[in-house]
Regions:
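Long, glycine/tryptophan/cysteine-rich extracytoplasmic
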Residues: 3-77, 124-162
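Juxtamembrane interface at the cytosolic side of transmembrane helices
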Residues: 90-121, 179-191
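Conserved aromatic-histidine-acidic binding/catalytic patches
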Residues: 102-105, 158, 168
Length: 191
């Protein structure tokens, strides 16, 4: 799941017509960064119309700027830099867990199993930070708010959508496999 998109967030509003933004102003969250989720970006250059936006990350930053929100790139900088090392460390711990028979051997699997929970907690924390640290100089004043972590929401005239992407599904599937491996290993150690 490291290379797959974990989550997507989209904004729709009347000033972003569906024929130009079929999925709204959409961004995709990966373990190592935020990517453009606009459909136009995935089409061939000669298919893109002049009035289509190519970078929804920049467009979302522009929208957020008007309410005084920090740019998306400000969030989770440390986490994104640490993600490759954490994945390797969690993988090494799981491999060690296959051979270690001492007390609390199962604990070596916990970080890899709980990875997506950590992602969601961190994601929710950053959304809270973004929604509660608004600049006073904003063109439009909104009260501090909690952006939608999961599901649909509303902020001013914008409808917001926030849902898992296929990377989250891969991560959950890997966790289920690890839980089954831990149960099998437990059975072996008790035999």
């Amino acid at each position: 799941s490291f290379f797959a998109p974990m989550w997507w967030v989209s904004l729709t509003a009347p000033n972003y017509p569906e024929h130009i933004y079929p999925n709204g102003v959409r961004i995709v969250l990966h373990w190592t960064g935020v990517a453009n989720g606009c459909t136009a970006q995935t089409r061939e250059r000669d298919e893109i119309q002049e009035d289509e936006v190519l970078d929804c990350v920049e467009e979302m930053n522009t929208i957020n700027h008007y309410i005084g929100m920090f740019p998306i790139e400000r969030g989770a900088q440390l986490e994104m830099k640490a993600a490759p090392y954490l994945f390797v460390a969690f993988g090494v711990l799981a491999v060690v867990g296959l051979f270690y028979t001492g007390p609390f051997w199962w604990f070596l699997f916990v970080p890899a199993i709980a990875l997506q929970v950590g992602f969601l907690v961190d994601f929710a924390g950053w959304l809270y930070w973004f929604g509660h640290n608004l600049h006073e100089w904003a063109a439009f004043t909104v009260k501090p708010f909690m952006p939608t972590v999961f599901g649909e929401g509303k902020v001013a005239q914008f409808s917001t959508y926030s849902f898992p992407d296929y990377g989250m599904g891969l991560s959950i599937a890997a966790s289920v496999c690890l839980v089954l491996a831990v149960l099998q290993r437990r059975k072996q150690l008790l035999a």
